């Protein structure tokens, strides 16, 4: 029996002993069918307690660790561990997979939870971030994911009463989650003082936002919202592991072994202590509880499951037991009864009944048990222990007979001899000890040759010999009982063995794979009766082999279930069962053995899913006599589709070469040529490695592919239309059921599939991201909605797509060998079949994955390589064509029968309504009936059958057929030789198209006089083609060797051909018969050329580095050109026939003289003057520009110059054909490039009249014919030179505003940094010095004076409880655009500033706010579709910024989109239907993303441009077309499925137009697009071509454009001086031909508009300076609605001492006075310098302002006239104050000084004193109430007090304590230590202000937060309330005079916020 076939018998899993209780929780439930579901190892178990039966789910491939029950109580979700863990959802009735969720988690899936309606599933990963995911599990789609927590999460649960809310808990945390859009956001639970912060182990949600959770200390923590409201103490005395909620209430289970039941309000009902019951024991710990009606389930840490009936709660039933934690190795079966014994590291020995599936006895030992053995009569049991001792027990009462310890190391193997007289014990020390049973186990022998630990031992039948295996892989023999080694081979050979459990030896060598030395098979056991062997290995597999199993790499059957290591396998005494034990999963599996007679070659009727019963992957074949592969198939499997460089790598290469060569001075690059090319016709069809790639379209055209082109061929006109969307070889093609769309798949690193329309040739969808190397098979589903594709990666992945959306529905690994065909089931959209090398599999989609079953051959046939497959008309029939020529007929997965159809493989099959047509390697087409019972007709493809209308010749009779299709009364056939034929049903055949066969094509020559060319290829043929409208092959000749070059003689009569073996021939050009041949060289001939005119000489270049010159007339070699150091690549003659130009592989350009071959050195300048007959060389100064920047990778293979010397065509290794203007001097000339060939373009030639260019591709075998389009006649639809967009020289224009905006770097709050450069220790980190004179606690002294003067003593002291945002002055115009809109027919406007979205009512002026953003908002858009009224989208700066979509009226968030745009989102826009949203980021790639915002799904995403993109807008009538503009950037985008395709704007030859920086977009009818440029022009585009310019629409940049949807009028806004005719806002007609200008009355010299919006008769305008203005269209009157500061930080802020007014002073050089009550600007003054601080005088008459340049001014409030000014300092004035008695002015500066001025002396402002000893710059100053002191806070975090006006520092604490301050704005001092947060290391508290009532202090900080504290605030980290709105820095803050308002100013956001105090 030396065959390697798999055995015909099988195993079926019958029972699993065990339950996983350790490291898991909440994994035990009742199903709807009252069964119990749980898991153990890698198996999901459904246990029916009534019938005592188990069902198994085997879809996992590693340990299951989590389980959730669907609300319908039937579906189960399980999650596993592993490198790529997945989640299965399965049905507990039939244990079938319903859905698979994969490709997201790593390490493992720790928790699972279904939501209350069962639609969504939440999962938590075991990765470092404990990722939380939300799935639409039926679709297998990930909806959202987020970082869970930094530490383990133990439980997650949905809130059943609130949609989209979840709670998770774990190590020291609990989090409350909200799902909105695709954003999953968490808020941490607040433990507060109610309970200790501790680990929460489990939770359940209840009504009214209550959450119950079980804590580590045994308490129940009860939460309301986020806050811990109470604890139920001592619910358990130790950790609560499980909390179960049901209708009746709650059940909890804990580490204390108790179950407690609680009612729905969590009042206790009862308590059950399992430790106290009769099966209980000390240390019992409950991991899982479930309560259903009157029954409870409890799962314990030690793998037991208890069932308790509540009425009889003192009698729990133990319904399942298994071993506890610890490895399980020991297994033995009783020699006479169906009993098994196991022993484990849990120190127990257990006896199991195999017949009853029950534990009958358990015995606890002192030590871990590692091996067991029954004596032959079954009376005694020996146990080997971990400490090296062994124990013998009597079986009947489990009492000890002996306990012997002779060894130190663990005993891993022991066996009694068959006669019962000896016990052999093998230990890890190495020896085997032999003991005599009868002599009370006296040691009588020792076998000690092993150098390593003993793994297995077996006795001979007669008990005289022992064989051992050890850890070193040695197999040794000993005589018994002495232990003498036995070496004689003969003697060993004859020994019959009593048992076979050894893994080494000739009988079991087949269990080891070929060519490996592995040690991962732990155990085997032979069944002599049935000649089978069972094995268990480290991969969790149990396998069946034939026994004996002699040849390595034998086939087997394999069974899954154990997770990691199967430690032991044994047959039962009667061979009915196999038992296997799992190491880490410590479970025991009992398998039923189904002998061959029973299984009778037919697989079980219900093969288990997940390929559980499978023939193993590795052992695909059942038989060893697999025929060798057919040569064609063999050849095909060897093809390698890897590329050194993929097209996708080009941008990177360009980038790298840019970085390397950036030092090169930028010379003017040569211009691209005016003329262009159009691909007209391609000769070729890819048949040699593709199949089923030929179809009729709806219109009766033929569609197929060659190279990177899909061809739609018209039979009547013999013309081709070409789809050129691919950039590398197409490998597969399929047609939509309606026959109008086609899908094609290509080669690539990330291989793409295009779905395109055969009429328009437009790409409808581009599918990427899931295949590597290439896509080798495609098929549409029967309804045409889905597409399935198969990749060329190592696993041949299968991907199922919703192709219109471009989303993958499901994926799976296909097979390890190549898959040739995939087919969708016509009746069931979710079923597929694949065939390939030794493979047929039937697939069923399950959620995001597939389950598969292999074809089961039974006795009807055997496993073959399948080449084609088709579904029949009857429901479950499948027909597959095999490599043997047979057709296999399948029903479901069973093979019914086979039918012989062809000689050699059946490559093609096509199903008809009533039958099939097949084609094979034998070149015969056969028509069959619908069950392959009769062959109705055959057609042999022969030359004699060809009709006269054929467009070519058959290369040979009976070519191998690779594709067949029927339609239009014909059979269409594609052959391996690259021919396409149409067979009429009556017999005649027409050849439509043909090309070269497999092999590279290099040789190409154009006829000197006629439209004819010749090609020669490695396929060993020379072919002559006609190029007129006939496009056909005229002649073909087979050669003995492949050829690489050919050339016509000048008269066109002779044709020279150079071959690969160093020979060449000259043939007659008409008959292609030999004229002469030579063989002078060994290496291949690389180029061959006749000299001009008479063609006297023939030059022959070879890879031997020589060029031979022959005299044609005498047929002799006359000269040899030597001197090249490498192989010759190209040669050209000069026009006199005297000089040869030669290029070599070492990039040498050499010159030789004919006929002798003398070498000449010619200077470049001279060489340029020589007139050459032909130019095919690629070197020299006139070609320098054709080499690309990254030419170290790519080579230019060929070039050819037109006869007039103007146009040079080249072909390169990237598949590009390029046109250059000749001469091509200087580096990197511009060009036009064309795609079509796939990898290498090997040769290019112009036809004799220069009107046509011919190109051949190397491996793609194609001959392409391009027509030259002269400048005038061009169709302008050209892909122009790609390179030109990167040129530095054409900069896109300049404007200071745009330049500044480009340079803004958006950093975020996350990196919050101090806005001031402070130094020193933060106040809350300073150590306090204890002063000597601390007052005694009870002081007899007078009471301390107030800290703060109370201004309004009369009123009741009012405490401020809350702040509410009331109004914002500001609008972000300086770096945003189009961020201002009308709402509600012009009643409201919406805009943004800082982090606030603002809706302002125009009639009342009141504002409402959207404050959910966490940082500056950068963009805002309003949905224009009536269905989504008032829906607004905004987005922001941030490392992971979110887009918020919200309702402008209610301010409800409708959806949140977490983005990939790092740094921020700077533009968003809704599509025409309002359902899609496009966003663009400020990340380095400027990614453009399209979203389906309501679901929160990303539709597509792609890098937009390397520089800033300013605007991206959908066409107002489209959901797929949009336009982006930016820095030198103009792209027209199409959304195709889930891919974004773009066309660059083509400027063409318009005068005065060049690619500018574009700033804005508007749209017109008929596909018109208008873009505003930086120079003030508006460019008008039709499709993507520029058609005209609106010159100088504005004098400066056109920043904004608005298209009015209702009448199509366009508003533009830009930078312009207001004049009579011109203005910064203009209203245009629909075509932008006429306009009307509006002046904005802002008083600025140049107005700069950033945003416009048109309402009814009004235009809303936003300016760069932060104003919002409304302009009437009729009256042209402008009305300022919002006034804000311009760009620049606002630092100065002061509130009026008695009125509701305040002043703000900003770096924009203005000071503005505002009215708090009416919310409006009262007055403003331009100061001429940036202002830093401001202060009112106590009487409110004057205001002092300090400037950044050291100057200060005093203005009169009413007139804002200057009262006085002074400049005594050079650096910024930081704070300024007027004393309460109106006498002194204090001025604090950056020069570490405070200067005092006496105001009573009039406007001279003489300094009367100043403070010295200030350690750093001044930040805040406050006067005392009596004007005698001033407190100064400084940049060194120190506060000092000085006398006024002398400036002397006050150091006595006593004095300072007693001062009453007039105001408090200091952030320093003990009184305010509590305002400093813990996380202030990067950021500071900038400002503070205490209320006039002295009870509260409000602060502003670098995080943009306002915080409200009580005052004084002397405890560190005091409690506070926080308010958002500002973006990064709050610079200053003040209470109004009566504490009604707080005013705060922003740093970066240039906004003033007014808050109401409540």
Swiss-Prot record:
Keyword Cytoplasm among record annotations: yes
Q: Which domain of life does this protein belong to? A: Eukaryota
- Start and end residues of the WD repeats are 59-100, 104-145, 148-187, 195-233, 235-273, 280-321, 323-362, 364-403, 406-445, 561-601, 725-766, 770-811, 814-853, 861-900, 901-940, 996-1035, 1038-1077, 1080-1120, 1191-1230, 1236-1276, 1412-1456, 1460-1501, 1504-1543, 1553-1591, 1593-1638, 1685-1724, 1726-1767, 1768-1807, 1880-1919, 1925-1958
Query: Can you cite an annotated GO cellular component?
Result: microtubule
Q: Which Gene3D superfamilies match?
A: YVTN repeat-like/Quinoprotein amine dehydrogenase
User: What keywords is this UniProt entry annotated with?
Assistant: Cytoplasm, Cytoskeleton, Microtubule, Repeat, WD repeat
What the entry lists under InterPro entries is as follows: Beta-prop_EML-like_2nd, Beta-prop_EML_1st, HELP, Quinoprotein_ADH-like_sf, WD40/YVTN_repeat-like_dom_sf, WD40_repeat_dom_sf, WD40_rpt, WD_repeat_EMAP
Q: Which PROSITE patterns match?
A: WD_REPEATS_1 (PS00678), WD_REPEATS_2 (PS50082), WD_REPEATS_REGION (PS50294)
Q: Which Pfam families match?
A: Beta-prop_EML, Beta-prop_EML_2, HELP
Q: Where is this region: Disordered?
A: 604-627, 1322-1352
Name its cellular compartments.
Cytoplasm, Cytoskeleton
Annotated Acidic residues bias: 615-627
Chief localization: cytoplasm
Q: In which residue ranges is the amino acid composition biased (Basic and acidic residues)?
A: 1322-1337
What family does the Swiss-Prot or TrEMBL record give for this protein? Belongs to the WD repeat EMAP family.
Q: Which PANTHER family match?
A: ECHINODERM MICROTUBULE-ASSOCIATED PROTEIN-LIKE 6 (PTHR13720:SF52), WD-40 REPEAT PROTEIN (PTHR13720)
Question: What is the recorded function of this protein according to its Swiss-Prot or TrEMBL entry?
Answer: May modify the assembly dynamics of microtubules, such that microtubules are slightly longer, but more dynamic.
Protein name stated in the entry: Echinoderm microtubule-associated protein-like 6
What is the primary gene name for this protein?
Answer: Eml6
